[in-house]
Amino acid sequence: MTVALAATALVSAQAQSEFKPLAGSVTTDFSLFANGIFNQTESPVALGSHAGINAGLIKGRYFLQDNIALRLSLGLNNSSSTQKTTDPVTEATTKSNVFTFGLGLEHHFGGTDRLSPYIGAELFLGSATGSMKSVNSAATTISKNAPRFVFGGDLLLGADYYVAPHVYLGVEAGLELLHASTGKTSSTTTPAGGTATTNESKSTASAGGFATDVKAGFKVGFVF
């Protein structure tokens, strides 16, 4: 009987180690839906055109123990678009840049041989900038949006399911507490053959609040 129990425990441990990461393992995963797919409550603090910190999320984890992982999150979203008209002749170029960074810890529970549920906490910060350049026969105007900065923390709940050794699919939800501040806007107009004139706003703003959000929708990841 004792031998049978020991054999069962050994097989179970081998099955878990075949799929799940152990102490010293490194994982990385990528968001399949960067802005979430189940959002019912959007963050009251937007970062650029994105709510919360969901811009192009990539996450890495280092397992300090079999069930404790240090996590690092990085979000990037850069875009540029140009519109042209012929009557009158104008060209408008819009650019935006969003960057986010997070650092936290996860505690993983036993689950099953393939399923790894976890809870965690994370601190994050981010920034967003944007501008528009408009060119016509009369003048060139460059307008810079007010830069936005956000910082805060998350309480996290998620699960990873290992579809094959060292390959997993997962989902993660989070309760966010965040604060954002907004800088000044500016606009520079240069008439054709003239001198540039710059106007800058004098005011700044800030906001904060709670939001519930499936931060990264589904994700796919790998264990190294």
Where are these regions (language model features)?
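Short glycine/proline- and aromatic-enriched beta-strand/turn motifs that initiate or cap beta-hairpins
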Residues: 14-79, 83-84, 130, 208-224
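Short sequence motifs at beta-strands and strand-loop junctions characteristic
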Residues: 49-53, 93-100, 111, 145-152, ...
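Outer-membrane beta-barrel architecture
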Residues: 59, 104-106, 154-158, 219
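Residue-level signature of outer-membrane beta-barrel architecture
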Residues: 62, 107-109, 159-161, 177, ...
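Transmembrane beta-strands of outer-membrane beta-barrel proteins
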Residues: 24-30, 70-72, 99-101, 117-123, ...
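Outer-membrane beta-barrel translocator domains and adjoining extracellular loop/strand segments
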Residues: 38-47, 51, 81-94, 128-141, ...
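Predominantly the C-terminal beta-signal and adjacent terminal strand-loop region
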Residues: 163-224
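Outer-membrane beta-barrel channels and translocator barrels
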Residues: 65-67, 110-114, 162-164
